């Protein structure tokens, strides 16, 4: 692939890690953010120490506070901003874009107010003549590992397979590999909903339960994620892939996962507001729990783990009692995903 110009919107941990992948591939990378000290640090010290204390970035990776400068003459735009501001940033991008670009996003969540997936938001806010079909970049990926060039395999999903193949070529190298998929609904819902299950797995750890319980919540969590996704129009096979079971494993078993760490803290009895303050990063699984619970209630989808976590976070139920309560639920077949 020839050298491409890519704007990455959101210089958080994942946006920064992906900027390095693209830079390693010889592309022109521009990070955009709205925190002056962070932007100055990236440009002058070539570090982003809030997320990576010991990593020095290549000097070719630049950052700006000026969205117009970031978008000028780019071939592709990657959204890596928190779910709750995706629509706002998309509107700002739409007001500036003056040429067609490949639009990608690598965030994992559902909009709280509308319950919409992020690709839908981008399609609504950015005129079709200025963008490709949206490409979703998702899968089992800790930024802490990608930034040190550890082997990572993820998915590029789009309704337009050619757009997905473009993104596959854009990012893939000797340590970072993408597979294509056309099931956007499946890939996005898997990426968003697995954060809920990671909170649950972390809570079990915080409560002192062992590997048996953690394996159970991850596998039964996959079942309820699949049930909801299929109801929304996804292919059930997607949940067996990188963006499904792959992402669920990496997020539901690792201390690198902010959702897992948040769940572990909840299990230890810490207050949510203290957890969010101490972590200093967005915990997407907290907001997604509420959205998924509401969707499941509207559609009549059985999601006991999501319900237990929802009641603990939003209704003040004791998290241990909520989890143990699932043990007395109605008996079911293991393979029910519909």
From Swiss-Prot:
GO molecular function, one term: glycerol-3-phosphate dehydrogenase [NAD(P)+] activity
Any Pfam family the entry gives: NAD_Gly3P_dh_C
Keywords: Cytoplasm, Lipid biosynthesis, Lipid metabolism, NAD, NADP, Nucleotide-binding, Oxidoreductase, Phospholipid biosynthesis, Phospholipid metabolism
GO biological process: carbohydrate metabolic process; glycerol-3-phosphate biosynthetic process; glycerol-3-phosphate catabolic process; glycerophospholipid metabolic process; phospholipid biosynthetic process
InterPro entries associated with the record: 6-PGluconate_DH-like_C_sf (IPR008927), 6PGD_dom2 (IPR013328), G3P_DH_NAD-dep (IPR006168), G3P_DH_NAD-dep_C (IPR006109), G3P_DH_NAD-dep_N (IPR011128), NAD(P)-bd_dom_sf (IPR036291)
Catalytic activity: sn-glycerol 3-phosphate + NAD(+) = dihydroxyacetone phosphate + NADH + H(+); sn-glycerol 3-phosphate + NADP(+) = dihydroxyacetone phosphate + NADPH + H(+)
Main location: cytoplasm
Annotated catalytic residues: 194 (proton acceptor)
Pathway it works in: Membrane lipid metabolism; glycerophospholipid metabolism
Residues reported to bind sn-glycerol 3-phosphate: 108, 139, 141, 194, 247, 257-259
Domain of life: Bacteria
EC code: 1.1.1.94
Amino-acid positions noted as binding NADPH in the UniProt annotation, renumbered to this chain: 13-14, 108, 143, 258, 282, 284
GO cellular component: cytosol
Compartment list: Cytoplasm
PANTHER family: GLYCEROL-3-PHOSPHATE DEHYDROGENASE, GLYCEROL-3-PHOSPHATE DEHYDROGENASE [NAD(+)] 2, CHLOROPLASTIC
Family the UniProt entry places it in: Belongs to the NAD-dependent glycerol-3-phosphate dehydrogenase family.
Described function: Catalyzes the reduction of the glycolytic intermediate dihydroxyacetone phosphate (DHAP) to sn-glycerol 3-phosphate (G3P), the key precursor for phospholipid synthesis.
Protein's recorded name: Glycerol-3-phosphate dehydrogenase [NAD(P)+]
Species of provenance: Streptococcus pyogenes serotype M28 (strain MGAS6180)
């Amino acid at each position: 692939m020839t050298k491409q110009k890519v704007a990455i919107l959101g210089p958080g941990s994942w946006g920064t890690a992906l900027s390095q992948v693209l830079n390693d591939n010889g592309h022109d990378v521009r990070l955009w953010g709205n925190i002056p000290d962070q932007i100055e640090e990236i440009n002058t010290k070539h570090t982003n120490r809030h997320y990576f204390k010991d990593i020095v970035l290549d000097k070719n990776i630049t950052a700006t506070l000026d969205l117009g400068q970031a978008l000028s003459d780019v071939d592709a735009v990657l959204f890596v901003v928190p779910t709750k501001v995706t629509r706002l940033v998309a509107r700002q991008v739409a007001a500036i874009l003056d040429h067609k670009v490949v639009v990608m996003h690598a965030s994992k969540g559902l909009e709280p107010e509308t319950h919409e997936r992020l690709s839908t938001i981008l399609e609504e806010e950015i005129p079709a003549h200025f963008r490709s079909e949206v490409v979703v970049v998702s899968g089992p990926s800790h930024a802490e590992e990608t930034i040190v060039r550890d082997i990572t395999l993820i998915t590029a999903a789009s309704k337009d397979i050619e757009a997905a193949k473009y993104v596959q070529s854009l990012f893939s190298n000797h340590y970072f590999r993408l597979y294509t998929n056309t099931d956007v609904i499946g890939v996005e819902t898997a990426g968003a909903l697995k954060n809920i299950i990671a909170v649950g797995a972390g809570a079990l750890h915080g409560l002192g339960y062992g590997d048996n319980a953690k394996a159970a919540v991850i596998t039964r969590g996959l079942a309820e994620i699949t049930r909801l996704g299929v109801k929304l129009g996804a292919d059930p096979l997607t949940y067996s892939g990188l963006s499904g079971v792959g992402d669920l494993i990496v997020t539901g078993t690792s201390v690198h996962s902010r959702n897992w760490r948040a769940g572990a803290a909840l299990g230890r009895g810490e207050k949510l507001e203290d957890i969010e303050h101490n972590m200093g990063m967005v915990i997407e699984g907290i907001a997604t729990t509420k959205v998924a619970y509401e969707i499941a209630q509207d559609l009549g989808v059985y999601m006991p783990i999501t319900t237990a976590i929802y009641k603990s976070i939003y209704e003040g139920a004791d998290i241990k009692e909520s989890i143990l309560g699932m043990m007395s639920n109605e008996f079911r077949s293991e393979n029910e995903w519909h």
